[in-house]
Amino acid sequence: MNILLISPKYDSYIVAPHLGLGYLSSTLKKYGHKVKVLDGLREEIVYNPEDWDIVGVSAMSTYFPECCKDVEKAKSYGLKTIIGGPHIICDPEQSLIDSQADYAASGEGERTLTQLASGKEPSQVEGLVYWKDGKPKRSNPDLKSLFEQ
């Protein structure tokens, strides 16, 4: 799968690498996925639907509105979206509603996004919130599988 991970552009004078997206990228590449990380503070974010299967957007509370704008823009190109980060972990269902993303990672994104990118059914992806019948639903993976790794 081809995955674009972004940290939104927001008003800040501090420019530091986004380590969380680096961890995600490394894990996804380990499983054979093509990944690009874009930092909105340093570069222009371009959404090309021919290049990406899904766009992951990180959010801290200070720039959650910018996260929502990036989700909206990615979706306008027909791209699937997943949100994650500290803001989303605090209230994944409401974050999914507010952003209108396709998915929200409610815990450690490395496992969640790797399972989703590998084609696992959303209901079986650990730590995922997704839409079902127009409402946010938390995944309910087979608990036995949690102990098999």
Give the positions of each predicted feature:
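Conserved adenine-nucleotide phosphate-binding loops and their immediately adjacent elements
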Residues: 149
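Glycine-rich beta-alpha loop elements in corrinoid/cobalamin-binding modules
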Residues: 24-146
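A short, glycine/small-residue-rich beta-strand->loop->alpha-helix junction that serves as a flexible
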Residues: 10-19, 59-64
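Nucleotide-activated donor-dependent transferases that construct or modify glycoconjugates
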Residues: 2-12
